[in-house]
């Protein structure tokens, strides 16, 4: 609510502190497990559900008219909602975006007639959290709570919650679509992908990667696509940036690829080795798990393929300013791809449970480092 606006700068700290406590608690539990015990254990959902309910209410009802910048585009969404509520019209940005993100704006227009802006943001938070939670639970019921903890501990979780609302909801719905594809419910998976693109057209990329990974699921092809994308990007990356900008399926994405100015700062086009290193972590783990340890199943291959095929497209455009916005279209499933093999396969010959606990801690530690550096 607006009376909490003076406390806006502490909202991220509250999120970080609570997730830190949850992560450290799970770390201390898993770290004590003998060898492969983490694989056979079921994890309690109760604490996670309490956090998710708190997050939906507290952050869904966040101050929306503050200009402090702590909540990204929240103010833009709020002003658009206000125009709909008071005058029944969109602003210019909304009028442009409704052509592609049609479902999001249909829901926004309907909600503007029956609720205030804070309830609408809380509804959008439900649309973000619930599909992700349901997807994690369907993918791996025994370890679903830990999969979700990996998700909420990733650096993009909070950003999708308060800034990239449409994109976050779309990606969350794709996670649920992945889970249904694993269960061979192809019709519902396709419907959910269609719904996801209605929230944000860029969801076409991970949706296409999902269906591609179902039909082209051999690991060697995934690695060939990803490594090939790196080679092509290194060789002719600048030309690819220009080509993708001209051919982009999303006008906003094309603008991002061409934009050289960000918040008053002139940035350079360069190969983002830092982003690539981050993206490679679940891929390196997959290489070791699949090719060295010979451990995988159809669920893991579908998760890995969705991530690697989508990430390969980003690698092709890696030199572009704001290429991280394309990377998010694969990074949203990164935590699940990272956690799934650790919780289901005997990946490490020694101290598997302890190493899994350390990876959980390091995963959230990376989020902490980015926050401190930011």
Q: Which sequence ranges carry the predicted segments?
A:
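Transmembrane-helix signature of polytopic, membrane-embedded enzymes
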Residues: 136-153
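Signature aromatic-anchored transmembrane alpha helix within multi-pass, membrane-resident enzymes
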Residues: 226-227, 347-369
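Alpha-helical transmembrane segments and terminal signal-anchor/GPI-anchor hydrophobic tails
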Residues: 70-78, 85, 90, 105, ...
């Amino acid at each position: 609510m607006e009376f909490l606006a003076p406390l806006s700068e502490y909202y991220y700290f509250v999120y970080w502190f609570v997730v830190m406590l949850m992560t450290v608690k799970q770390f201390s539990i898993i770290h004590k497990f003998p060898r492969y015990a983490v694989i056979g254990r079921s994890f309690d959902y109760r604490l996670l559900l309490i956090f998710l309910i708190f997050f939906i209410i507290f952050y869904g009802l966040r101050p929306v008219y503050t200009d402090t910048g702590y909540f990204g585009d929240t103010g833009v969404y709020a002003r658009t909602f206000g125009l709909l509520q008071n005058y029944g019209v969109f602003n210019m940005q909304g009028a442009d975006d409704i052509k592609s993100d049609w479902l999001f704006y249909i829901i926004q227009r309907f909600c503007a007639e029956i609720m205030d802006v804070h309830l609408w943001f809380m509804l959008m938070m439900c649309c973000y959290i619930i599909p992700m939670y349901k997807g994690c639970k369907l993918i791996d019921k025994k370890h679903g709570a830990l999969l979700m903890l990996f998700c909420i501990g990733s650096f993009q979780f909070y950003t999708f919650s308060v800034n990239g609302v449409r994109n976050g909801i779309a990606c969350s719905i794709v996670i649920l679509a992945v889970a249904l594809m694993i269960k061979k419910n192809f019709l519902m998976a396709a419907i959910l992908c269609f719904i996801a693109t209605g929230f944000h057209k860029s969801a076409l990329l991970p949706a296409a990667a999902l269906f591609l990974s179902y039909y082209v699921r051999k690991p060697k092809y995934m690695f060939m696509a990803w490594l090939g994308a790196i080679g092509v990007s290194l060789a002719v990356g600048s030309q690819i940036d220009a080509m993708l900008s001209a051919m982009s399926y999303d006008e906003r994405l094309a603008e991002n690829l061409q934009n050289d100015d960000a918040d008053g700062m002139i940035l350079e086009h360069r190969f983002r080795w830092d982003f690539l290193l981050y993206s490679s972590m679940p891929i390196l783990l997959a290489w070791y798990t699949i090719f060295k340890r010979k451990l995988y199943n159809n669920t893991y291959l579908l998760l890995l393929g969705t991530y690697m095929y989508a990430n390969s497209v980003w690698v092709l455009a890696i030199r572009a300013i704001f290429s991280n916005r394309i990377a998010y279209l694969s990074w949203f499933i990164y935590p699940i791809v990272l956690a799934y093999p650790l919780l289901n396969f005997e990946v490490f010959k020694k101290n598997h449970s302890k190493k899994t606990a350390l990876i959980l801690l390091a995963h959230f530690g990376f989020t902490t480092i980015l926050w401190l550096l930011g």
